[in-house]
């Protein structure tokens, strides 16, 4: 059985055919307070960071090498944002035990959406083009990085980025945003929204296990109960 192979011209033709019929799958994110979440490994001046790595080794799944596009990664859920960050750490270093001090060093950040944001749903896009969805999630970033650059180049004035499903946690969505020329900034830091995991409290009960009886979950509980990591308290 023949497998799908990434051929740029074939994907381009498919995308342009959908665009010609106004069938590019899209989603809207409405304005609001504390709409998006983002993990940061230390306290930065802002969570709204459009990173543009140059070296291929520094590029994420949707970063085009060479620093061509600044990309802001975020998620609908703190759980998904954390799963993306710590799932990569597990794959890179096999780390499942974290010293309790990490809870005070790593941050969950909240982002406000200050204008309506429109993104391309790349999962639905690939479904429409009969591109296997594992092409968006495997260890080879060639296709996803090309796709991001292509969509930005051809649709960057119409959309603010892309939406996709986390391969680490199938809960809500992840986003890779670009800066849209000619429009005001879409995102701002939620006032007081940079919180170390040590003092973070989650209220989204949709992510809690059925047996969870409390109405909130601490950052430490998220690590252990939802992400299956262990927090180790070292002797002082």
Segment roles from a protein language model:
Residues 2-60, 91-236:
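Active-site and NAD+-binding cores of ADP-ribose-processing enzymes
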Residues 61-93:
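Extended catalytic/binding region for NAD+/ADP-ribose chemistry, centered on the ART fold
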């Amino acid at each position: 059985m023949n497998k799908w192979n990434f051929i740029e011209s074939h994907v381009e033709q498919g995308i342009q055919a959908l665009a010609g019929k106004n069938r590019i799958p899209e989603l809207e994110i409405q304005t609001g307070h504390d709409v998006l979440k983002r993990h940061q490994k230390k306290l930065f001046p802002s969570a709204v960071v459009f990173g543009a790595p140059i070296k291929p080794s520094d590029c994420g799944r949707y970063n085009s090498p060479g620093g061509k596009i600044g990309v802001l990664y975020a998620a609908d859920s703190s759980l998904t944002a954390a799963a993306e960050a710590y799932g990569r750490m597990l794959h890179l270093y096999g780390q499942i035990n974290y010293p309790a001090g990490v809870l005070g060093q790593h941050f969950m950040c909240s982002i406000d959406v200050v204008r309506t944001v429109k993104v391309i749903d790349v999962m639905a896009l690939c479904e429409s083009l009969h591109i296997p969805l594992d092409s968006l999630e495997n260890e080879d970033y060639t296709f996803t990085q090309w796709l991001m650059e292509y969509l930005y180049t051809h649709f960057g004035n119409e959309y603010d980025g892309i939406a996709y499903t986390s391969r680490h946690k199938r809960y809500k969505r992840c986003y890779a945003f670009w800066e849209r020329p000619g429009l005001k900034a879409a995102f701002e830091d939620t006032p007081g929204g940079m919180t170390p995991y040590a003092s973070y409290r989650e209220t989204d009960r949709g992510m809690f296990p059925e047996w969870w009886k409390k109405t909130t979950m601490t950052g430490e509980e998220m690590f252990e109960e939802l992400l299956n990591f262990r927090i180790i308290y070292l002797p002082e």
